[in-house]
């Protein structure tokens, strides 16, 4: 499972991205408001067949998957994260950003506390696509009680989780008094549950992080 339900405003007119097997694909951004009025601006990719329904400043609802791809930026390898659109729907009047995902912990989770005392755990989920041999490696972040419990998960653990795909702006220090504006894209988790072999939910190992949801939405 790898599904995102996203609705919001189209920031700009879609632009040609790539062509494969005779089919053209286009990319653009959707801005989606949280309840806190903060905005996540997410890159989306769609096939040409949807193009005539995508107009700048229109509100729209889409269903798709979170996709990732490595690319070279000079000598560095970076991760491209975007929403691959599979369905278009009429805007329902409220912005939405909800993700359901199952996958495997593929790195050692990193637990830390911010200067303001917030507990955070960063980790990466490998989600296998339905086509054989391809996976998407999705950065994820957990907060509070969820942060502590996810920090204890072992590499290879199969989990189901839900949350929001967020864009987070930050400043990276590149010199003594010099900073670079950057944007991180990550799955902000509000619930997760361990899965048994075959994808069956394990009732003994689940964490509902809804007690942290208000902080998650205002973060």
Regions of interest found by a model, annotated:
Residues 45:
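A positively charged, amphipathic N-terminal helix/segment that binds anionic biomolecules
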Residues 59, 63-92:
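Short, structured interface segments
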Residues 1-7, 13-24, 33-41, 49-52, ...:
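Acidic, gly/ser/pro-rich intrinsically disordered tails
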């Amino acid at each position: 499972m790898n599904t995102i339900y996203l609705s919001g405003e189209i920031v700009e007119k879609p632009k040609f991205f790539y062509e494969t097997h005779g089919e053209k694909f286009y990319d653009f951004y959707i801005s989606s408001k949280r309840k806190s009025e903060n905005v996540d601006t997410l890159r989306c990719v769609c096939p040409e067949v949807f193009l005539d329904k995508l107009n700048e400043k229109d509100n729209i609802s889409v269903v798709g998957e979170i996709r990732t791809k490595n690319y070279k930026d000079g000598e560095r390898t970076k991760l491209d994260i975007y929403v691959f659109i599979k369905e278009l729907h009429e805007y329902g009047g409220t912005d939405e950003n909800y993700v359901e995902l199952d996958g495997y912990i593929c790195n050692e989770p990193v637990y830390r506390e911010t200067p303001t005392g917030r507990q955070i755990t960063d980790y990466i989920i490998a989600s296998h696509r339905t086509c054989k041999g391809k996976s998407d490696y999705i950065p994820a972040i957990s907060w509070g009680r969820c942060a502590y419990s996810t920090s204890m998960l072992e590499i290879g653990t199969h989990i189901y989780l839900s949350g929001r795909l967020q864009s987070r702006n930050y400043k990276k220090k590149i010199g003594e008094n010099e900073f670079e504006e950057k944007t991180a894209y990550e799955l902000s988790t509000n619930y997760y549950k361990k899965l048994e072999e075959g994808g069956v939910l394990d009732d003994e190992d689940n964490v509902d992080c809804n007690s942290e949801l208000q902080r998650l939405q205002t973060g």
